[in-house]
């Protein structure tokens, strides 16, 4: 992955995190940071240049039960992607960055509207569990 493609993937990740925060605020659920990037945790005195420290985040119900988990590959991974897991719906999607298209799952663009619909499905699956 080229440096510019890598940068664009992490910028798309920041955008996805903003969608998660917006969804949480609109629906009255929790946005939670689950994990930071290892190179942020162990950076010591080195500069940190990724646009966020968050590597894994979740949307959870009022009791803290996650219904959607999202993560991005760490910088050292060779094949970088964003993963979306819907634990109760048994769905696991991978999104990749494609120039000119943004985030795509397979060949389908991952838009904010599509993400909100996916989160709604995941939330409904948790309600019936």
Curated annotation (Swiss-Prot):
GO (cellular component) term, any one: plasma membrane
Key words, A-Z: Cell membrane, Membrane, NAD, Quinone, Translocase
Pfam families attached to this UniProt entry: NADH_Oxid_Nqo15
Catalysed reaction, written as an equation: a quinone + NADH + 5 H(+)(in) = a quinol + NAD(+) + 4 H(+)(out)
Membrane topology annotation: Peripheral membrane protein
Top-level taxon of origin: Bacteria
Enzyme nomenclature, EC number: 7.1.1.-
GO biological process: iron-sulfur cluster assembly
InterPro entries assigned to the protein according to its UniProt record, in alphabetical order: Frataxin/CyaY_sf, NADH_quinone_OxRdtase_su15, NADH_quinone_OxRdtase_su15_sf
EC class name: translocase
Subcellular location: Cell membrane
Entry note about domains: Has a similar fold to the mitochondrial iron chaperone frataxin.
Family that this chain belongs to: Belongs to the complex I Nqo15 family.
Protein name stated in the entry: NADH-quinone oxidoreductase subunit 15
Annotated source species: Thermus thermophilus (strain ATCC 27634 / DSM 579 / HB8)
Gene transcribed to yield this protein: nqo15
């Amino acid at each position: 992955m080229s440096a510019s493609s890598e940068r664009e993937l992490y910028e798309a990740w920041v955008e996805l995190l903003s969608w998660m925060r917006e969804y949480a605020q609109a629906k009255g659920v929790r946005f939670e940071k689950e994990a930071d990037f290892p190179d942020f945790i162990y950076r010591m005195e080195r500069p940190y240049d990724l646009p966020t420290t968050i590597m894994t985040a979740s949307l959870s119900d009022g009791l803290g039960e996650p219904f959607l988990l999202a993560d991005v590959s760490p910088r050292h991974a060779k094949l970088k992607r964003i993963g979306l897991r819907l634990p109760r719906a048994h769905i696991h999607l991978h999104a990749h960055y494609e120039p000119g298209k943004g985030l795509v799952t397979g060949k389908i663009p991952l838009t904010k509207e599509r993400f909100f619909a996916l989160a709604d499905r995941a939330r409904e699956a948790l309600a019936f569990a």
